[in-house]
């Protein structure tokens, strides 16, 4: 009974799978068709959605790959962005126009040198010939290399590079200045190497540096200041009474430390750091050293103390080696010496009457001399660069204020003459403010150097305006058809016959950078030597080749820039 019921039930189920069941009943057939179509549509829709989903996923994957490729391309381009391509990145149209004007001035100076003095040390524009002021070391050629590179003058840079590779020869029977050869030639070659990565510049820098090394072979380690490049005989100038000069002996540290870093050979760094160690043993309480030092005993003579000629860059390098050394404990003694010297500097600072120009005196014995060289106008830039390193913010602010006041004085060295170009030095007499002493102008860079630093570190556009006024004065008074010349007298405008190599290395470079984006040679990545040759900051003991790290990347400014504003410092 139960079995028959199960069979009957099973037969009842299977009848729905029999087509005759539906053919005999049209309504059932219609329902079946509708059901079939509905199921088919559902299945098809699900398959369609699946295909659409897969298609969209595929498209998204392709887009991800495309974006990854774009990112890689951007990274590749960014890594290859040198200062050459940064010339197109501007902060405002006025800066762009002024950069172009300065660049055109560089092209004029360089093409004149190329036409009339190629391969010689310096151009004499009036007579349209060259002169070997530095023994035929190609001073202008080497001094201008990094300026050409920074301005994106690729063709000129490559032609100069070929000359360096094929014609630059240091095997000369010539008594070279240690100081000038280091800051111009060693510094210029190292900067060209750091910027371009071209090893020919490093090889040449090693060649000339090796020829200078015997100058440090003295009883104290204080170097002689003159050396024969061929024979290695070193001595001091007779007019110095056998003494070494402070600036000439203490302005090789940046270049030779950099050379040791880039070659892995410590001998260069050891020579120059011994000088600082020796001087630091008996460093005076006020941090101020006379300009003459005995190379045998390292004792200073009773001579002038100055931040002008023969003293200036010693103090500059105490600060810059600290910056170049990443401000680590290994170079802390440089900073300590510099801060001590800056406290001593305060004892040399006076104000004129009636206009209260702040100036730096020279010191002879216990007497202050109311005289300031234009060379000392590097000091505002140095003070601005060092101000942020004080542990006490109030101290930093004090020295930044001093920097701004001194810059105003230096700018007025220019504005106080009929040509609007500064004389070589100035005297400050009570009741008459400043008066020009030695009245020539040889295209010096120190004031525009300080304006560059102050612009970068404060954002005050007034410093750009001052720099532009100085540039226009050079254009009006010093530019001639065959280059640029100095003035024999800034009062009359009578021209001389020399285009100094530092005009291309320093004056035009700092003017160009004064109007360039702050990402071009950022101050937290590069240190300028005293000839304005930028050297790349790296780990002090890291001997890795810099070629891959020499790219100047698009990035935020080196320092936190204050809001840009106008207005010179007001005088109380």
Swiss-Prot record:
Listed name of the protein: Mannosyl-oligosaccharide 1,2-alpha-mannosidase MNS2
Pathway: Protein modification; protein glycosylation
EC number assigned by the record: 3.2.1.113
Cofactor section: Ca(2+); Mn(2+); Mg(2+)
Annotated localization: Golgi apparatus membrane
pH dependence: Optimum pH is 7.0. Stable from pH 5.0 to 10.0.
Lumenal side: 46-572
Residues modified by glycosylation: 326, 460
Family note: Belongs to the glycosyl hydrolase 47 family.
Protein residues bound to Ca(2+): 530
Coiled coil (residue ranges): 51-81
Claim: Magnesium is one of the keywords in the record: yes
Keyword annotations from UniProtKB, A to Z: Calcium, Coiled coil, Disulfide bond, Glycoprotein, Golgi apparatus, Hydrolase, Magnesium, Manganese, Membrane, Metal-binding, Signal-anchor, Transmembrane, Transmembrane helix
Free-text tissue specificity from the UniProt record: Expressed in flowers, siliques, stems, leaves, roots, pollen grains and shoot apical meristems.
SUPFAM superfamilies hit by this protein: Seven-hairpin glycosidases
Protein encoded by which gene: MNS2
Annotated S-S bridges: 377-410
Function statement: Class I alpha-mannosidase essential for early N-glycan processing. Progressively trims alpha-1,2-linked mannose residues. Produces Man(5)GlcNAc(2) from Man(8)GlcNAc(2), but only Man(6)GlcNAc(2) from Man(9)GlcNAc(2). Has difficulty acting on the terminal mannose of the b-branch. Involved in root development and cell wall biosynthesis.
Enzyme class: hydrolase
């Amino acid at each position: 009974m139960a079995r028959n019921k199960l069979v009957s039930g099973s037969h009842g189920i299977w009848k729905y799978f029999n087509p005759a069941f539906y053919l005999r009943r049209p309504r059932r057939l219609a329902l079946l068709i509708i059901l079939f179509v509905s199921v088919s549509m559902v299945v098809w829709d699900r398959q369609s959605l699946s295909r659409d989903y897969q298609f969209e996923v595929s498209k998204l994957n392709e887009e991800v790959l495309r974006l990854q490729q774009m990112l890689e391309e951007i990274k590749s381009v960014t890594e290859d962005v040198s200062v050459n391509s940064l010339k197109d990145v501007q902060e405002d149209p006025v800066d762009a126009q002024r950069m172009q004007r300065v660049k055109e001035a560089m092209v004029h100076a360089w093409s004149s040198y190329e036409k009339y003095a190629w391969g010689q040390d310096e151009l004499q524009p009036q007579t349209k010939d060259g002169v070997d002021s530095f023994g035929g070391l190609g001073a202008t050629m080497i001094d201008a290399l990094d300026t050409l590179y920074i301005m994106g003058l690729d063709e000129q840079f490559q032609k100069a590079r070929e000359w360096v590779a094929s014609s630059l020869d240091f095997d000369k029977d010539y008594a070279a200045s240690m100081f000038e050869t280091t800051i111009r030639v060693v510094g210029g070659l190292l900067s060209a190497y750091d910027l371009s990565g071209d090893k020919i510049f490093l090889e040449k820098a090693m060649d000339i540096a090796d020829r200078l090394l015997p100058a440090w072979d003295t009883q104290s380690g204080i170097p002689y200041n003159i050396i024969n490049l061929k024979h290695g005989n070193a001595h001091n100038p007779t007019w110095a009474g056998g003494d070494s000069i402070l600036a000439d002996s203490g302005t090789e540290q940046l270049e030779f430390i950099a050379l040791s870093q880039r070659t892995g050979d410590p001998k260069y760094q050891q020579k120059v750091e011994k000088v600082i160690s020796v001087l630091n043993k008996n460093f005076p309480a006020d941090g101020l050293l006379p300009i003459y030092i005995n190379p045998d005993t390292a004792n200073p003579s009773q001579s002038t103390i100055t931040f002008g000629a023969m003293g200036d860059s010693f103090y500059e390098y105490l600060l810059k080696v600290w910056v170049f050394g990443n401000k680590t404990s290994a170079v802390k003694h440089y900073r300590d010496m510099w801060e001590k010297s800056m406290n001593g500097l305060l004892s040399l600072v006076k104000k004129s009457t009636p206009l209260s120009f702040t100036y730096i005196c020279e010191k002879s014995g216990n007497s202050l001399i109311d005289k300031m060289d234009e060379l000392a106008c590097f000091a505002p830039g140095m003070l601005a660069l060092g101000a942020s390193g004080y542990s006490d913010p109030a101290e930093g602010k004090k020295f930044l204020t001093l920097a701004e006041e001194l810059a105003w004085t230096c700018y007025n060295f220019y504005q106080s003459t009929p040509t609007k170009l500064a004389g070589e030095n100035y005297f400050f007499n009570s009741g008459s403010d400043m008066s020009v002493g030695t009245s020539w102008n040889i295209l010096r860079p120190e004031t525009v150097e300080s304006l560059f630093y102050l612009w970068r570190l404060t954002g005050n556009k007034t410093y750009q305006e001052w720099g532009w006024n100085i540039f226009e004065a050079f254009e009006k008074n010093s530019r001639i058809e065959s280059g640029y010349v100095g003035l024999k007298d800034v009062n009359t405008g009578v021209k001389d016959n020399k285009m100094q190599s530092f005009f291309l290395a320093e004056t035009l470079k700092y003017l160009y950078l004064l109007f360039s984006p702050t990402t071009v040679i950022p101050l937290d990545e590069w240190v300028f030597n005293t000839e304005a040759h930028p050297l790349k900051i790296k780990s002090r003991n890291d001997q890795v080749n810099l070629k891959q790290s020499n790219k100047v990347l698009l990035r935020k400014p080196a320092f936190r820039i204050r809001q840009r504003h106008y207005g010179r410092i007001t005088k109380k």
